[in-house]
Amino acid sequence: LRDGDRSRYLGKGVTKAVGAVNGPIASRIQGMTIGSQLEFDELLLNLDGTPNKSTMGANALLGCSMAFCRAAAQSRKLPLYRWIAEIYQPAVIGILPVPLMNIFNGGAHALNGLDFQEFMVVPAGAPSFREALRMGAEIFHHLKVVLSGEHLATTVGDEGGFAPNLDDYENKHEQAFEFIVQAVESAGYKLGKDIFLA
């Protein structure tokens, strides 16, 4: 939910969303005992009452949901990732967290004509978060080399991934994936083993 007031942050301000948090959301949840993350999220969705979260704003609802989740983790003296794993997938606690790294942008956050919003790499084959982060960063830098080699722009989109214009390619969406595959291989990793795409 954005304010739409062009005199503040060119219309991208979020005082309406903040007002929803401090107003109707706060009024509804103050003093409540809420048993689970699912119950809290359902309460927020019902309070908004729209399929696309347009009343309160996805930014307000997500912020509240995340705050509830963090508070629940802190009350149990657990790291956030471990708490989320216990809620949703207790069997995979040993391999979390695995970052999803946005390395190629399209959609509304890039002016390159790609329909997909984000092309991500998932270094799920890494033995630790530290190694996963390193793998993702190396792939990102290799992707810059791949794009430069094709004489494509290496500026980044709003979400931090590269956002070159691929209109000269017959199938620009497949080409975006092909560039990512080249970067993964150039970095020395194997798709489907070390790295997955999302």
Stretches with model-predicted labels:
Residues 1-78, 87, 133:
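Metal- or metallocofactor-binding catalytic centers and their adjacent structured scaffolds
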Residues 64, 171-188, 194:
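Active-site pocket-lining segments that scaffold enzyme catalytic pockets across diverse folds
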Residues 89, 94-157:
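Mobile "lid/hinge" segments at catalytic clefts and subdomain interfaces of large enzymes
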